[in-house]
Amino acid sequence: TLIFLIGAMITVELIDAHGGFMFITNHITTKKKKKLLALIAVITFFMSAVLDNLTTSIVMIMLIRKLLGNYKERWVFGSIIIIAANSGGAWSPIGDVTTIMLWVRGNISTSSTIPHLILPSIVSALIPVLIAMRFLHGNVTPPNAFSQMEADNELLKKLKDKEKLSILIIGVLCLLFVPVFKTVTHLPPFMGILMGVGILWFYTEMLYARKPIDEDLKLRLSKVVHRIDGATLLFFLGILLAVDALRCSGVLSDFAFWLDDTVGNVYAVNLIIGALSSIVDNVPLVAGAIGMYPVATDAMVAAATDPAYLANFMQDGVFWQFLAYCAGVGGSMLIIGSAAGVVVMGLERINFIWYLKNISLLALAGYLSGAVVYILQNLIL
């Protein structure tokens, strides 16, 4: 995961260093906070369904840095990016690590998961955005100093618009290539992202070879690597090690078995797992659930003493789909509860207590609203 994060950050930094994101920011003309927040949330939600929420968060943070100069405004927008990224990843089999796990192991399928989870996921992102918009007024504060720095960048002046656009397109395609690479080769995602870095590196070297640019101005990969945020990487490593310690000690698996024995209801178990995923990583929680419950077959359901309950554990059953939703969306309730939250916290230095006081209730409202929508869907349809 850490190597994947490094690869994603290098890719995004390469695009940004060569002015690729300027094409997007130049087309975002609105200065009103409410409209901009809604636009950022929509882009993040659907981008996260194709990319993973970690990469999406990095890309969107780089975008809002070019649009917002006030760090408190960026904290609000960054928090909504976390919520939208987690919600967007929940309804797509390739949108989050947990949905990929469930999809690859045969617990869920694309044809059933998307239509069942897209509406709850939209609601889980829409409610926090609507609440947040009520507290936003006026226009955004543009980042004057940052814009001037870009204007003074000699490299960007020497690159043509089509060359900047080509770097953006190649970079985005490299990011989109990762889930395809994993599905086709069954190799870890970090190998796909490193291959994408290699492709982008090769293209920029070819670009420099054709243009008369001073060596000092060239932003080769070796220079860009030094620009990525090392503190974010170390912070992310610390979170991963802490969660892995809980997993290795058996605390998470023991709690999963206790949940099964004590609660029993598939909706309640998943809601609790979702709440827990805001404290610890959702990957070991989902892995524990997969280990506890095998995918039920028609024969197993027919032979069961309670066939209606066991049917929830068939492929695309209620338990697995609701698990994908809860584990994905529940991580938004605390900023340390998801990979997207951890990386945004590191990049923007968002205060944990600030997020808890200002955003956690919004995320909880969205989480419960989406859960209610999913439960009602199953009761009505």
Q: Can you say where each PLM-predicted feature lies in the sequence?
A:
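Alpha-helical transmembrane segments
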Residues: 1-9, 112-128, 184-197, 269, ...
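Transmembrane helical segments that form the transport core of multi-pass membrane transport proteins
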Residues: 18, 40, 174, 178-315
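Hydrophobic alpha-helical transmembrane segments
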Residues: 2, 37-42, 78-79, 114-118, ...
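Transmembrane helix-loop junctions at the membrane interface of multipass transporters and ion channels
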Residues: 99-110, 173-187, 378-381
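Hydrophobic core segments of alpha-helical transmembrane domains in multi-pass membrane transport
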Residues: 6-13, 44-45, 85, 121-133, ...
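Juxtamembrane and boundary regions of transmembrane helices in multi-pass small-molecule transporters
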Residues: 70-71, 75, 79, 91-92, ...
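Intrinsically disordered, low-complexity non-transmembrane regions of multi-pass membrane transporters
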Residues: 136-170, 201-230
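Membrane-interfacial helix-loop connectors
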Residues: 47-84, 88, 97, 101-117, ...
